[in-house]
Amino acid sequence: DKKVIKLGIGDVTLPLAPVVVEAMKKGAEDLAHKETFKGYPDYEGYEFLRQAISDYYKSFGVAVAADEIFVSDGAKSDCGNIGDIFSKDNVVLVTDPVYPVYVDSNIMAGRKIVYAASNEANGFAALPDENVKADIIYLCSPNNPTGSAYNAEQLKAWVDYALKNDAIILYDSAYE
């Protein structure tokens, strides 16, 4: 008998950080009072949240203006929506295993999917195959569901591949 490991979608394994719990409590309390109540945000997300994200990245020396940040309700709707800007004739490359929504949203749109195998031999970090042509590349690092993470050299290999093939990389930095 062997243990079966579910590799459909990654799952969190630790409780929420205390700072997150406190922020959620404060947010819930704010919703209970007319003076601090906030309804639905603008389409791109609350300004205060986008500014906080901008400030966070600035602390690492990365300049991203708040108006360049989009806060959404999650990857599922984003994957479907972002696909609408690409041609249905585009070939999509995903690593395997991968977050199922990347595959599902593109199959529903009628795009061809090609897979790059992530396995023990490559440390569960698939690298580009020069014999495969893709227009859109989904990279998730740390990978969902395996948790493997690309290093800078491996990411550069993907960027070089994308530049050579005039491809777009959709990068999901899950579990930051």
Per-range role (PLM):
Residues 3, 112, 168:
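Residue-level detector of anion-binding/catalytic polar loops
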Residues 11-13, 98, 143, 175:
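Active-site-proximal loop/turn and secondary-structure-junction residues that shape catalytic pockets
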Residues 29, 84-87, 163:
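Residue-level signal for alpha-helix termini/capping positions
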Residues 1-73, 81:
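N-terminal small-domain helix-loop-helix segment of the aminotransferase-like
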Residues 118-176:
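Active-site phosphate-binding strand-loop segment of PLP-dependent enzymes
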Residues 84-141:
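PLP-dependent aminotransferase-like
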Residues 7, 24, 53, 69, ...:
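Generic structural signal for small/hydrophobic residues in well-ordered secondary structure
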